[in-house]
Amino acid sequence: MDKSPQELYQERLKRYEDAQAGRVPDRIPIPLFTVDFHARYAGYTLAETVYDGEKLSHSVEKTVLDFEPDCFEQQHTRNLIGHALDLVGYIPEKWPGGEIGDDDPFQYLDMEIMKGDEYDELINDPSWYFMRRMVPRTARNLRALEKFPNPTAFLYHGIVYNLAAFGTPEMKQAMDLMHEVGKLALSTIEAEKNFIRHMANKGFPAQRGGAMVCPFDAIVDFMRGAKGGMLD
């Protein structure tokens, strides 16, 4: 007797969870983890699945249904980012259809973004450091955030005068841009949630709900660069 999608979903999910928890599964689970195979398999360029949500969904669904893995890596928040990266002018990466060819894979550029003498500044206030240092250095269209005021200065009447930075045309442009990118992000998150539900109804669980970056990766890959991080 053929199993229902719901039965297959629970069977695959248990298999994957058992393996993650160190229990012995009924067999080795096979996840589908791909950055660009789904696009090529479905006959799209990489740029099409980076800029077009419908083509991305179709390519991932076709790949999952044809290969029947035990779980799949969700791709919307990973890949459907072309328009948002264009808007912010993201510097440390090149993506299909943006500065490189439509069928060229993502290229992450090894760069020194955080300076070697800025560790104390980062440690003392990571949130302020990222807003005022990292974001302007990685997003050319958000450089106005270099003037972002330190929230600790918002005490008493400081809340008035330390908002002066937001009165400039450059800061307004940056705020408007962040609103537009935020709307794109919300739309992409919703598309991914809908796709996960859609695939669950077909019997396939998503591989994970989130990810973390270890401290070494955060510093070396995304802040100091390989040379700076290794020398540190």
Regions found by a protein language model. Name each.
Residues 1-232:
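Catalytic cores of TIM-barrel enzymes
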